[in-house]
């Protein structure tokens, strides 16, 4: 049997044709990557149908025309706990802030039960059932714990006592120290106050930006337990975390962001066991 070598597949002794061959391989790889990305985008949009909150193709940043997010997608269904991990500067917090109307969205949309909420202010989103806890311990230090809770419910102060009781069910310490000034609390306790205050408006979805940041390992574990308990009350939670391994242990689904794009997505368990995710992200992020 005779074998004929294709004319365009030259050996290393023909550098010109070899360069053409390498260029074709690069082009084919780019086309395959683009096709895979397009397929994954369609799958994501199909899965996102009926989601409580959805971000579609977000290009967003802190200034008009300057993007930190580059076609980022995310969805969370009723009752889900969704995590966002990735290296520093990947756009994790920016994605959360884009959902809450705190950064400029240049292209794309944010939807809440299929209603476009892209251009709504933060206070309007709170009224629609979206809560947000920023990364810093956002408490009023000169106010008592109880007064901080009142600030959380100022838009709708009805039934304050009943709402506060629900918060105390999750964070018993807040009830025991309700008359104590927030400025005298530890970092972990302040984080509980911040989350409790966001819950006073009884949100349908709660956005948490690195709630374990700056806490000791023991307090981090407590925060993650509380986050899961909040979710188990029926609140949809989207959490950004630098402690990637711990985050993936509690979430239903996760997103890995890199350079403002979705690098990987899957269940928490699948991402935690994915060799590429482990190699590229979990090895360093687990220590952060």
How would you name each of these model-derived features?
Residues 3-6, 29-288:
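Glycine-rich phosphate-binding loops of nucleotide-dependent enzymes
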């Amino acid at each position: 049997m005779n074998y004929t070598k294709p004319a365009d597949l030259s050996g290393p002794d023909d550098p010109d044709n070899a360069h053409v061959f390498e260029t074709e391989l690069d082009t084919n790889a780019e086309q395959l990557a683009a096709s895979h990305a397009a397929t994954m985008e369609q799958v994501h949009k199909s899965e996102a149908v009926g989601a409580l909150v959805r971000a579609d193709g977000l290009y967003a940043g802190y200034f008009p025309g300057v993007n930190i997010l580059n076609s980022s997608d995310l969805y969370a269904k009723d009752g889900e706990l969704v995590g966002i991990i990735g290296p520093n500067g990947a756009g994790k917090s920016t994605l959360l802030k884009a959902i809450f109307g705190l950064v400029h969205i240049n292209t794309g949309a944010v939807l809440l039960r299929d209603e476009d909420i892209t251009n709504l202010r933060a206070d309007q989103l709170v009224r629609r059932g979206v809560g947000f806890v920023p990364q810093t311990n956002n408490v009023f230090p000169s106010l008592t714990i109880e007064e901080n809770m009142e600030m959380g419910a100022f838009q709708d102060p009805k039934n304050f006592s009943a709402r506060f009781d629900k918060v105390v069910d999750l964070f018993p310490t807040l009830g025991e120290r309700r008359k104590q000034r927030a400025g005298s609390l530890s970092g972990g306790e302040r984080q509980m106050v911040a989350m409790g205050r966001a819950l006073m408006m009884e949100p349908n979805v709660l956005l948490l930006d690195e709630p374990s940041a700056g806490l000791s390992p023991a307090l981090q574990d407590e925060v993650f337990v509380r986050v899961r308990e909040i979710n188990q009350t029926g609140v949809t939670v989207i959490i950004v975390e630098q402690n990637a391994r711990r985050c993936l242990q509690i979430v239903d689904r996760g997103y890995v962001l890199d350079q403002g794009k979705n690098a990987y997505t899957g269940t928490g368990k699948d991402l935690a066991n994915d060799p590429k995710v482990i190699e590229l992200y979990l090895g360093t992020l687990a220590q952060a």
